[in-house]
Amino acid sequence: FQLHLTKSVEPLASICLNLAADHLNWHGSLEAYAADKAKVYTNTQLAAIYDLASEAALKMVQEADVREGCRAIGLSRAVPEISQFGIVDGAIVDRAFVPLRNKNAQIVAELEDLAHLAPGGKLEALPSHIISDALAAAALARAAGVQPAAVSKGLRDFTPGAHRLQTVATIDNVAWVDDSKGTTAHATAAALASHAPNSVVWIAGGDAKGADLSELVRQVAPVLRGVVVLGVHPEFITEPLAKYAPQVPYTIVGQGSPAELAKTMVAQAASMAQSGDCVILSPACASWDQFVSYNQRGDLFAQEVAARAGQVG
């Protein structure tokens, strides 16, 4: 929304992390939404950074009206080429902001620096989007002249904000995760992608903001054990489930006060989960149709899970 009205910002470095259908009820179309996001690159002075896996981001960079001397810097999950950041033997490597980058590279961090962000602190369970975000953060920092040791320390010390893939409890070997900030299909797909097949009880739904969630449901179907559906319009989730995951059972929370909704969704999720599973509140939708905010939605979820932990204990 801010980029829509922005005209005079001149960033040192910039990046568009993702583009997925969101806020279409405000922007009117995905094309208009993409055009507003692309403005993040306008007037960039030094580095227009983009994910090599994103054709949309590459197009934004190619078409951006940047300042003279601005370079395109790519992010890769593989060995980086010149003017790229990438991964080599478990290390984040800079081949963009180093002397003689045609033959030199600089390790700026280790993937081990991100282990505390993985479920259970296990590096092998680290969600792929966290690695992508770390590459982006490292590139932005290096563009601003930050030294490698400081990049590494920053990643080690980083603590996610509230309601962002927070494990709030483990009860009877079932992890309960608050990702209430996951209000888009893209965010929820990333949150569920690293889980094993048939191991997730997904709490989903709410105000879809004009987005079609069919592709999301198709993507995450293999990991689902069951779905608890929130929202005034549960069909945003139930109709794609019927089409792409008819084998996955679901329940509908229905209507009530925010506290009643939280109590019901936690009880329904608990009835589905089995030992080793993960119950994750990652709605892919805004909260406004039933809650004051995603914060309230996540807080009430965590409170109900804590109450259940006390009962079980």
Regions inferred by a protein language model and the residue ranges of each:
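Glycine-rich, charged/polar anion/phosphate-binding loops
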Residues: 1, 122, 185-189
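Short, glycine/charged-enriched secondary-structure capping and boundary segments
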Residues: 8-13, 29-32, 62-66, 87-89, ...
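Short, charged low-complexity linear motifs
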Residues: 8-22, 275-287
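Inter-motif core of Ras-like GTPase G domains
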Residues: 7-18, 192, 196-202
